[in-house]
Amino acid sequence: RGTLQAQVHVLHTACAIAPQDRGLLLVVRGAWTLQGEDGTTQCAAEQGVWRDGEPRAWQLTPVGDAAVLLWVHLYQTSL
């Protein structure tokens, strides 16, 4: 039996995320380009992507100077 823990990162600049099997990418302000192994998605504020399953890597690129994205990495821990 296990539980999930979260690490929350606030992003303002482009970055690459190593493969992870669960998490949330949520645009808070502006727009971001989310490039994953299965395609590219453009997300505006209050939009994002949720993953739970097969690990995926991401390349995240802000569109404009004021863009902000939350990356919530969820990972399993034992009790």
Residue map of PLM features:
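Ordered hydrophobic segments in well-structured contexts
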Residues: 22-28, 47-50, 67-75
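Glycine- and acidic-residue-biased ligand/ion/polar-headgroup-sensing regions
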Residues: 1, 19-38, 46
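Short, surface-exposed loop and linker segments with low hydrophobicity and enrichment for Pro/Ser/Thr
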Residues: 14-25, 58-67
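Conserved short histidine dyad/triad with adjacent acidic residue
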Residues: 1-20
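Ligand-binding loop in jelly-roll beta-barrel domains
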Residues: 1-4, 42, 53-79
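Generic preference for hydrophobic/aromatic residues in regular secondary structure cores
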Residues: 6-8, 25, 36, 69
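Short acidic-glycine-tyrosine-enriched beta hairpin
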Residues: 13-16, 36-56
